[in-house]
Amino acid sequence: MAYAIIETGGKQVRVEPGRFYDIELLSVEPDEKVTIDSVLLVQNDGEVTIGQPLVAGATVQGTVLRHLRGRKVLVYKMKPKKKTRKKRGHRQEITRLLIDSITLNGTVLTAPTATEETADATPDTETAAE
């Protein structure tokens, strides 16, 4: 299974092809393609490529699924014996991003197809009977 570690929105995220992730808001419309060049690490079939600080020639392609707001974070400030209370809430704007592929030096590492996933998930009848 191939994966990459990317930097977006001041955070580092471990991404795999075929999965979606909630990241900081991107100024891109839904259903548009996004290419992320800030790739810190790429792993494919046990071979790890680490950047210093970025991996040269590595990109991650994704599709923006939708924009949404995160859970509300409440901040409550109180000073005892003064009757001073402040309650504030904040909801972060986030983007749901589906990772299509990881590219390393022109080699595209894509998500496994549905037939491969179901073949791996079904147990072998010969080994299960023994």
Curated annotation (Swiss-Prot):
Domain of life: Bacteria
Entry-linked InterPro entries: bL21-like (IPR028909), bL21-like_sf (IPR036164), Ribosomal_bL21 (IPR001787), Ribosomal_bL21_CS (IPR018258)
Region of interest called Disordered, as start-end residue ranges on this chain: 110-130
Alphabetically ordered keywords of this record: Ribonucleoprotein, Ribosomal protein, RNA-binding, rRNA-binding
KW rRNA-binding (keyword) present: yes
SUPFAM superfamilies: L21p-like
UniProt record, GO biological process: translation
Any one Gene Ontology cellular component term annotated for this protein: ribonucleoprotein complex
Ribonucleoprotein recorded as keyword: yes
GO MF annotations, alphabetized: rRNA binding; structural constituent of ribosome
PROSITE patterns: RIBOSOMAL_L21 (PS01169)
Function: This protein binds to 23S rRNA in the presence of protein L20.
Sequence similarity: Belongs to the bacterial ribosomal protein bL21 family.
Oligomeric form and interacting partners: Part of the 50S ribosomal subunit. Contacts protein L20.
Protein name: Large ribosomal subunit protein bL21
